[in-house]
């Protein structure tokens, strides 16, 4: 009986944190399923967003004289080409942020503020990452794979986490749920 009492005491003492973790896992799981596995969402939302990102990357690097063009999700130039594939579109980082914000116990006003500012900002961060990876491919081709897999993805996740912490301190605590 002592173990059962300890489990009950643990669950009671940590009910808010456990609720957050459960909701976070559920929301992120649903997002990941819809993004990764549901073909309608993938074809109707994710692919057009990824093609838009490719066009935006092309427009930005052309501002610096790259003479690049877009073919679907591929950014091509005479110097280098990148394919913005699943996982490179910023949707996973946005989904993590969305799940954190929606799972946190605060007002809907604070949640909508966080999502309205946070998700577009994460996409801008990801866009900067893609532009930087293009130029890394042009000027540092021997290290671009390591930059892509380890450094750039880590930076996007860390900045997304920092954005969540900023939202917690600035907005979520200001509009607490009654």
Model-found features: residue ranges?
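Hydrophobic N-terminal alpha-helices or hydrophobic patches in metabolic proteins across all domains
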Residues: 1-178
